[in-house]
């Protein structure tokens, strides 16, 4: 996905101090952010001009100790053709020499009101999510009690209908039919809908419904972490399904492994309630309570008592 300076400005509500339409259309190609403190001393080895340049209180205070000519020289070296923009935090005053060098080198100058660390975190979070490599998977992503559950299965098995029932039970739809997943950082998988399918759900026999319009803003999310995969499968008499919770199946997406639970589907079974219970049970395991282990311990105690008798 291409991220432009204008998109960053709109997302983080930054003020454009200098920058025309052409400069704001510049692409940001990396999520890494540079604080050019060392470069201000004249050391440019390993300098990465393609990064966003962030000026905070430390850099600003150091600039105040320099002469006007030295400040201009510093920014003339920092600003390159490939530099997307410079962001000044805390609403600090923009030095005239910075503006002059920015105009001469074609670099947008932006200003944020937040602290330097807060602004850096916000920019990194946004850029990492937008620039991450994406994979599209077939399924439905639903936020169940704050946990992202990816529901997969054969076409026509009832994924969308199940998602609708979960929404009616107070949970939130993230994506239907196509889920774009990406690793925001190591070990963390996120999913979001394709823009054209945002907040929409397809129900066979009914058509396309707008979940946000029908059920309100509390029934949808624009993105969610993916923590659990539920695979719906047609019930077959000769098929063996886990009945004790011993299964440790996983699927791997974008290099991140998440647990997978296979749930048989047959007429009369309330799949949405089963998925809800599976999600709560998984969360309980994450918190240290394992119902399967409790059952095994009770069974072991019972066998021991019977043996003594």
From Swiss-Prot:
**Catalytic positions?**
138, 159, 177, 243
Keyword ATP-binding on this protein? yes
What are the binding positions for ATP in this chain?
153-160
The protein's UniProt keywords, in alphabetical order, are:
ATP-binding, Carbohydrate metabolism, Kinase, Magnesium, Metal-binding, Multifunctional enzyme, Nucleotide-binding, Serine/threonine-protein kinase, Transferase
Catalysis: reaction(s): [HPr protein]-L-serine + ATP = [HPr protein]-O-phospho-L-serine + ADP + H(+); [HPr protein]-O-phospho-L-serine + phosphate + H(+) = [HPr protein]-L-serine + diphosphate
Tell me which InterPro entries the record gives. HPr(Ser)_kin/Pase, Hpr_kin/Pase_C, Hpr_kin/Pase_Hpr_N, P-loop_NTPase, Ser_kin/Pase_Hpr-like_N_sf
Q: What is its EC number?
A: 2.7.11.-, 2.7.4.-
The record's comment about this protein's domains reads:
The Walker A ATP-binding motif also binds Pi and PPi.
Query: What does the protein in this record do?
Result: Catalyzes the ATP- as well as the pyrophosphate-dependent phosphorylation of a specific serine residue in HPr, a phosphocarrier protein of the phosphoenolpyruvate-dependent sugar phosphotransferase system (PTS). HprK/P also catalyzes the pyrophosphate-producing, inorganic phosphate-dependent dephosphorylation (phosphorolysis) of seryl-phosphorylated HPr (P-Ser-HPr).
PANTHER family listed in its UniProt record: HPR KINASE_PHOSPHORYLASE, PROTEIN YJDM-RELATED
Similarity comment text for this entry: Belongs to the HPrK/P family.
Protein name, UniProt field: HPr kinase/phosphorylase
């Amino acid at each position: 996905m291409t991220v432009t300076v204008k998109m960053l400005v709109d997302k983080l509500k930054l003020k454009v101090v200098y920058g025309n339409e052409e400069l704001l259309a510049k692409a940001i190609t990396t999520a890494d952010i540079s604080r050019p403190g060392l470069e201000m001393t004249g050391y440019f080895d390993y300098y990465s001009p393609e990064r966003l340049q962030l000026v905070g209180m430390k850099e600003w205070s150091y600039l105040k100790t320099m002469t006007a000519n030295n400040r201009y020289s510093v920014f003339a070296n920092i600003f390159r053709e490939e530099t997307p923009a410079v962001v000044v935090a805390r609403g600090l005053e923009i030095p005239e020499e910075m503006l002059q060098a920015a105009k001469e080198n074609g670099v947008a100058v932006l200003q944020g009101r937040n602290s330097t660390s807060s602004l850096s975190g916000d920019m990194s979070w946004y850029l990492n999510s937008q620039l991450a490599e994406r994979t599209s998977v077939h399924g439905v992503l639903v936020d169940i009690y704050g946990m992202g559950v990816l529901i997969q299965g054969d076409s026509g098995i009832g994924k969308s209908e199940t998602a609708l029932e979960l929404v009616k039970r107070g949970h939130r739809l993230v994506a239907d039919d196509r889920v774009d997943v990406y690793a925001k950082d190591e070990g963390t998988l996120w999913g979001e809908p394709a823009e054209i399918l945002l907040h929409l759900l397809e129900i066979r026999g009914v058509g396309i419904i707008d979940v946000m319009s029908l059920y309100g803003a509390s029934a949808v999310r624009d993105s969610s972490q993916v923590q659990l995969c539920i695979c719906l499968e047609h019930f077959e008499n000769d098929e063996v399904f886990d009945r004790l919770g011993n299964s440790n199946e996983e699927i791997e997406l974008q290099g991140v492994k998440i647990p997978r639970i296979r749930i048989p589907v047959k007429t009369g079974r309330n799949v949405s309630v089963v998925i809800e219970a599976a999600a709560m049970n998984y969360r309980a395991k994450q918190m240290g309570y394992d119902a399967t282990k409790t059952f095994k311990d009770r069974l072991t105690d019972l066998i021991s008592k019977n043996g003594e008798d």
